C-alpha cells in the first residue's frame, strides 16, 4: 500500500524481503517489508545500506502502555528500551538506542501536518510477542510483569519489536533512522 504512493514503483527484490523502489517528490525511495522483529529488520538494514540506502523510516504497529495512548494514535519514538537481543550484537548494552533527530523531527512534522493524534517518547522493544501478552504462562513471567510495571512508571509509551535493533544498527553503520507506529491496542 505504501509503495503505491511512489512514482514508477517497481518490485526490485522478491526473495528475502519484498522491496519496491520508485520516486517520491523526485527522490529515489525504496519500501521494504522486513517481517517481524529485530533480527530480520537488522538484516534488511544491513543489505539496503550495501545498496546505497542512508536514511530509514520504520513504520509499524505497537501496543500502547500508557492510558492516554489510545488505539488509532501515532507514536513517534525518541528512544527504545533494549529488551531484545539483536542490538547486543552491535553495541554494549550501555549504548542508548536512539533515532536520528532530523528524521524524528521530520516524522513529528508530518504527523502534525495530517492532524493525527500523536505522542513522542520512549518505546519498549522486545523479542517475544507472547511473552508480554501472556506473561503468566511463561517461566519468567514474574520478571516480565515487574519490568513491564517499571517501564510504565518510567513513562514508556508503547511496546513494539524493531526500533532498538534498528537504532543501534543505524548508529553502527553511520546511517539515519526514525520510527513511528500506529497504536492498534492499549494494553492497559
What is the role of each PLM region?
Residues 14-188:
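Glycine-rich phosphate- or other oxyanion-binding loops that anchor nucleotides, phosphorylated ligands
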Residues 1-8, 12-13:
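Single conserved hydrophobic/aromatic residue that forms the stacking wall/gate
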Amino acid at each position: 500500500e505504501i509503495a503505491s504512493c511512489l512514482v514508477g514503483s517497481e518490485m526490485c527484490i522478491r526473495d528475502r524481503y519484498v522491496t519496491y523502489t520508485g520516486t517520491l517528490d523526485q527522490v529515489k525511495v525504496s519500501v521494504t517489508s522486513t517481517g517481524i522483529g529485530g533480527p530480520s529488520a537488522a538484516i534488511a538494514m544491513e543489505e539496503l545500506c550495501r545498496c546505497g540506502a542512508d536514511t530509514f523510516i520504520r513504520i509499524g504497529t505497537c501496543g500502547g502502555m500508557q492510558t492516554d495512548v489510545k488505539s488509532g494514535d501515532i507514536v513517534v519514538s525518541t528512544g527504545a528500551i533494549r529488551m531484545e537481543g539483536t542490538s547486543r550484537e552491535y553495541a554494549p548494552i550501555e549504548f542508548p538506542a536512539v533515532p536520528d533527530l532530523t528524521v524524528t523531527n521530520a516524522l513529528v512534522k508530518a504527523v502534525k501536518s495530517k492532524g493525527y493524534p500523536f505522542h513522542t517518547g520512549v518505546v519498549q522493544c522486545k523479542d517475544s510477542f507472547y511473552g508480554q501478552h501472556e506473561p503468566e504462562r511463561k517461566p519468567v513471567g514474574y520478571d516480565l510483569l515487574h519490568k513491564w510495571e517499571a517501564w510504565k512508571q518510567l513513562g514508556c509509551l508503547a511496546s513494539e519489536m524493531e526500533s532498538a535493533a534498528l537504532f543501534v544498527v543505524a548508529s553502527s553503520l553511520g546511517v539515519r533512522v526514525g520510527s513511528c507506529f500506529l497504536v492498534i491496542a492499549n494494553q492497559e
